[in-house]
Amino acid sequence: MATTLTERFRFISPVQTETPFHVTGFTGVEGLHRLFDFHIDLVCADAAVDTGKLLAAPCRFEILRDGDAAPAVFSGYPARVEQRGFFNGYAYYSVHLRPTLWKLTQLRQSAVFLNKKLEDVLRELINSQTFFQFPHEFRLTAGDYPAPEFAMQYQETLYDY
C-alpha cells in the first residue's frame, strides 16, 4: 500500500529554484503588534546553497491550509542561516526568518529635527538607512500634521521611534 505525503509547509527563496527546500519542522511566534519570529528546519538535495545570498534575499514561509483556503504567508529576510549537516545526499539547513521591518530594530541612533513635519521626519529616517533598503509605500491618513518646533530621537531604533 503506497502512501502519498502532502506538503503542508513551504519555504520559498529566489536563491534556490533548481532544487527546492522542503520544510522538516519549525517553531515560531506571531501576533498582533508583534513581529513574527520563525525558526525553520529545511532539507535540500543541494549541499552547495550559497548561505550569503540566502541571507540577502527576501524569503517566504507558507503554512498551507485544507481545501481552497489561502495559505498563511510570512514574508521577510533570514536573520540567520546555518547548514546543519549532510546525510544520504541531502543537506539540512536551519533558517531564522524575521519580517522586513525587523531590520529597523537593529540600529540605535540619535537625531534632532527642527521645524519639520512628521512626514518629512519619517521620510528622512527611512531613506537614511543605506545599509538595508526595503520596498515600502509611504501613506499617512487624511489630515494635516503640524511641524513641531523640536523633535528628538535619542538612542532609539527606527522601529521604536
Q: Where on the chain are the PLM-derived regions?
A:
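Amphipathic alpha-helical and helix-coil boundary elements used as assembly
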Residues: M1-Y161
